[in-house]
Design a protein with these regions (language model features):
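Nucleotide-activated chemistry modules centered on ATP-dependent adenylation/adenylyltransferase
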Residues: 1-187, 191-196
Length: 196
């Protein structure tokens, strides 16, 4: 970060909003965004379909191994998702628990506490260290607005760590981010490669 300048780096969002309000900027009262900023207020599935071809396949209940429906393309589903599965029947408590990219199968499981939703450790790669600190115990976030998760960290090399959370965490998803904090300080971030 030697050649990067963050003009708002020392102040928090409430103060930024206050300053924006004082200058009469419309962003002062704009709702926070949790989507992908560069696609705007468009339908995410529609956006993806403009660039990637749909590849329909089957949906399988991972517990019974039975086909329970069809999907429109694995790219549209995330681990832990329960809405928008469109597989009919009593799907209020059906959750996406896995994807087989080679066979084009979407796996679902019944119940919020299903063992297939839980993992207990994750291999994190592409590490971006934001601090010289390398604690063995700290807090992690695997999703936006998720409560802090107490974790143990094993530093494998300069680019890989193993994050352990013996209490189990739902829907930790390969391809998404893991961010570690020591108290209020963000110490590193990386990409979830695999969960165990």
């Amino acid at each position: 970060f030697k050649d990067v300048l963050f003009p708002l780096g020392d102040i928090c969002k409430p103060e930024v909003r206050k300053i924006a309000s004082e200058y009469g900027l419309v962003t002062a009262s704009k709702k926070d965004s949790t989507g992908i900023c560069f696609i705007g207020e468009r339908n995410f599935k529609q956006f993806l379909s403009n660039y990637l071809p749909n590849k329909p396949g089957i949906v399988v209940d991972i517990d019974t191994k039975n086909k329970v429906g069809e999907h429109i393309g694995l790219m549209y589903y995330t681990i832990g998702q329960r809405k928008g599965l469109n597989i009919g029947g009593n799907t209020d408590k059906m959750f996406v628990v896995g994807k087989d990219l080679n066979k084009n199968i979407l796996y679902v499981a019944f119940g919020e506490e299903n063992k297939y939703l839980l993992s207990y450790s994750a291999h994190i790669s592409d590490i971006n260290f934001l601090s010289d600190k390398k604690p063995e115990k700290c807090a992690a976030k695997f999703r936006y607005r998720q409560p802090d998760i107490d974790v143990q960290v094993e530093y494998l090399d300069d680019n890989n760590i193993l994050v352990k959370y013996p209490q189990g965490v739902k829907a930790v998803t390969p391809g998404q981010a893991c961010v570690l904090y020591l108290n209020d300080e963000c110490i590193l971030g990386g990409i979830i490669e695999e969960v165990y």
